[in-house]
């Protein structure tokens, strides 16, 4: 969950960006298997101890086993080795730009400040979002991968079309 350790949540968010970059490099650029692999990370603001990272892809059903293999391989690599300074910058820069741009909208502030009157941690989290993201290191990304991208808590979901349709 986010409030148990906001910096860890930011570390995990950057790790998710690195995972997505690697999936794009492998699946789109390397294999031409799909155009848009996606990674989503969620740290609950409500339920203690809850959060997830998910990777998804639109791919022909025959490509699913290879996708799962690639995700596991990339996850293991993120757990076992530090990422380069270049890869860290490529993960953080777009995220920081996205945050800065979002902060110019009312929707961002409505979402960020929702509930702040009853939970002041939300204000602290909003204030520290950019500096906390800037602070993420390659070691932090590796620690996040070791904590989250574990084989023992990973599960796969396949959504396939009905046969013949």
Residue ranges and their predicted role:
Residues 25:
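Carboxylate-rich, divalent-cation-coordinating active-site regions
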Residues 145-147:
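Short, exposed beta-strand-loop hairpins at the edges of beta-sheets
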Residues 150:
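Glycan-association/targeting regions that enable binding to alpha-glucans and other polysaccharides
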